[in-house]
Amino acid sequence: MTASPKDEMWTVFKRLLGYLKPMKGMFLLSVCGLIVYGLVDAAFISFIGPFIDKGFSSSTPAISNGIALPTSQGFHADNQVLLMAPIVVILMFSLRGFANFVSTYGISYMSARLIMDMRQQVFEHYLSLPVSYMDKENTGNLISKVTFDTEQIARASGSALISIVRDGVTVIGMLGLMFYNSWKLSLCILVIGPIMGLVITIVSRRFRKVSKQIQTAMGDVSAATEQMIKGHKNVLAFGGQETETARFAKINDRNRHQNMKLAVAQAVSQPLIMVIGSFALAFVLYAASLDSMKADLTAGTFATILGAMMAMLQPIKNLTRVNAEFQRGIAACTTVFELLDTLPESDTGTYTVKRAKGNLRFDNVSFSYEGQERRALDKIDFEVTQGQTLALVGRSGSGKSTIASLVTRFYTGLESGDIKLDDVSIYDYSLKSLRSQVALVSQQVTLFNDTIANNIAYAYPGEATREQIIQAATLAHAMEFIEQLPEGLDTQVGENGVLLSGGQRQRIAIARAMLRDAPVLILDEATSALDTESEKAIQQGLDNLRQNRTSVVIAHRLSTIESADQILVVDQGRIVERGTHKSLLELGGMYAKLYQMQFGS
């Protein structure tokens, strides 16, 4: 049985309030400021009646022989009341201004803190999610949750607090004032209350639905923009400007269309509420003209009731306006909380080791990616011991990189078999301990927008010495180009190393793996971006790195794995051949054909 939209909204709202607990002092201060602000408005209207009735009174007619004669002396004013009025007004509005400052500052502080806390939580949660989740999610939507959705939540929270407390107190104060002065005239408000409530309920559902659609549309905008920026060179090279422009225009127009839906709902709801309110005001004016009412009304009383009704219109309008903002925030909360409720990467293992020997074994491993029927790996079985090099070769999509990904538990859920490191299942290791035993250099190098030195020492921030960094860079043959840079190791590489060539980025990644000094080394096309000369230069460094380490090398260039202790030929998830370079050539099978394609006879 699913929860009703009302129950779901209340659940989300209660969860959101949990973020305000650490700021309860500031929250209470802001609420007090808002209450004072609303009460001052109500108090100001309450002074209208006494000010008119006592400050001014009708001119007293002259009496001659029992006949009242009109005079031209105007009103008889109570000077004491008139003298006090300016002082009261100044004091009240000074108090109102101070209350406004306190509440505005407090709400701004809480909104900024809420954005910071939620963004931090979402960012940290991304780091705990499995690779399989990140693979299937739209990057633009993930970024939008950190940037756009958290802003929506904070804005909605601030607007809702201001309107619900300040405008709510104002409306309640005005209603109390009206009933105190004339409960008969004030009863008409109770008639329109349910009608207003019905309109707000209907519009709220529309707001929430459209707001979710807006968040999806914003994610699409972010994704399309990111895709164009990342592929900017390819777009220009292949003349894809018109295609990308048309694609973005379509997505952009969809986003505009969703925003217009929300604008229409807002534009209809606010005037509708005001029209309903005008009927109440018109009824009060009509009722005041009835003889039965005149006996109970003074000029001051009527002015107070009329002023209170007029003063209520703007707060009521604000409450209907904030409803749209609030529903937008609730929709954003729902998407963010759904993300935060996504289960993090499974880490049930408890086994830890400072440094493993590096004996790696696959025991009859079968594996399928989520949502795919065909097995990515089918009964993979091999063993590689400390100091040995295992090479994986085969066509693209044959399953080589999947084997490497399973070693680091980027993907879990084996259909059969087990993977063991030093005769202990990798699923018994804690994730931190397991991954500290592995150094990975993948085909697609990731560098961070930082210095070369910090990228090399990424696994040991603040711990690796300058000498260790230089040594790793030297072994990777990276110092050759680093020394030619104006700032050397302190050179900023730009976003994802954009200021460096592909080969330079690859060498920095290799230096990073060297500094890691892990017992298991995975090289997934580690030299793919290097030219022949650079590849030869770095090969000696890789040979040095492999000593006393278990190395798993994935390569298309067969020249880089000729010295491997064992070569596995993988095709459609199965091991079809295994042996040394020499024995596989003599076998004359798939490996020999691949070798012949690259080097001829």
From Swiss-Prot:
GO cellular component terms attached to this protein's record: plasma membrane
Family, as annotated: Belongs to the ABC transporter superfamily. Lipid exporter (TC 3.A.1.106) family.
Keyword ATP-binding: yes
Binding-site residues, ATP: 394-401
Topology term for the membrane: Multi-pass membrane protein
Phylogenetic placement of the source organism: Bacteria, Pseudomonadati, Pseudomonadota, Gammaproteobacteria, Alteromonadales
Protein name, per record: ATP-dependent lipid A-core flippase
Transmembrane portions of the chain: 32-52, 81-101, 160-180, 183-203, 267-287, 296-316
Domain ABC transporter, first and last residues per copy: 360-597
Domain ABC transmembrane type-1: from-to ranges: 28-328
Origin: domain of life: Bacteria
Gene: msbA
Database matches in Pfam families: ABC_membrane (PF00664), ABC_tran (PF00005)
Catalytic activities: ATP + H2O + lipid A-core oligosaccharideSide 1 = ADP + phosphate + lipid A-core oligosaccharideSide 2
SUPFAM superfamilies documented for this protein: ABC transporter transmembrane region, P-loop containing nucleoside triphosphate hydrolases
Broad class of the protein's primary localization: membrane
Entry keywords, A to Z: ATP-binding, Cell inner membrane, Cell membrane, Lipid transport, Membrane, Nucleotide-binding, Translocase, Transmembrane, Transmembrane helix, Transport
